Amino acid sequence: MKRTEEVPVITNMAAGPFLSRELSALSDGAGVLLEPVPIPYMEYREHGGIYGKAGMVFIWLDLEGMLPGWDDGGGGLLEGCASLVERTYQELCGYLSSVSQAELLIALFENYSSPLAIVAGHESDMAVDGLNRRIQEGLSRQAVFLDMRHLIASVGTGSAYSPKDR
C-alpha cells in the first residue's frame, strides 16, 4: 500500500488537475503517492502548518498573472517589473525557509502568451530568460529550479508528456 505525501503547490494558475496527473505519474513505482495541495499565491502565508509537514514545496507562478502587461510592447521587460518579481521570490522563499525544512522547487517563467512558433529567440522570450537568470542567481542556495521549456526540448515533446518515457 502506498503512503500519501502532500505537496504544497503555491501558484497563481488553475493547475490542480494537471498537477495531480503529473505528480501521480512521477510517483508510479516509488511507493509513495504525491498529492498536490494547491495554495493560491496571495494566500501562501495562511497555510503555514502544511509546509512544516511537507518534504517539498512546489512554486509555479505565471508572470502574466503576477504582472499583467509586463511586456512593454517592444519585447523588453521593465526593470521595475524584474526587481518586483525578484523581491517577491526572495520574500516567498525566505518565509518558506523560516517555517519549513522542505525542498523548494521553482518552475521558471515561460512566456505563456507567445505562440510556440515564435517563442525561441523572440525578444520577449529573451526578457523572460533574463528574469529567470536573475531569480536563479539570487536564490540558487535556497531552491531547485525547473526549466520546463528546456527540459522538454532536450527530451522531445513525445517523451516529455509520456508517463512511460519520462
What are these regions (language model features)?
Residues 1-166:
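Extracellular glycan-modifying ectodomains
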